[in-house]
Amino acid sequence: MASFHIIVSYVTVVLAIIIAITFAARRFWISRYRSIRYSPVENSFEADFNNGLNSSSFDIAQNILAQDTRAGLDEAATSQIRGLMKQLQCSFDQARLIYIRKVMSDNNVDSTGMPLDNKAVTKL
């Protein structure tokens, strides 16, 4: 019975040492995990302009000239619009229109901007 208590005490000491080492090294592992998980996206108006996401009706050149520091266009939307441009061989404006119509349709809104939900209040 004494050997059982000795084994339990050794296991307890070993676990305490492992916990202490883990606690002491947490700053290293947390920073390492964050650097692996997070990678900055190269998303700016200049990058969008260089990728052809610009037209006379959607002019982001003014943002570039004004040295706008905002992140640029939405990354998910730009990748879908670029895909539409490539797949349908259409211009940026046409692809943007197709994308916006799809987003509106997915959100139950018709092409005029009116909600298709019969419970929606549109007039007061």
Curated annotation (Swiss-Prot):
Coiled coil: none annotated. Keywords: Signal. Residues 1-24 form the signal peptide. One of its GO terms (cellular component) is cytoplasm. InterPro entries: DUF2015. The keyword Signal applies. Pfam families: DUF2015. Belongs to the UPF0357 family. This is UPF0357 protein C1687.07.
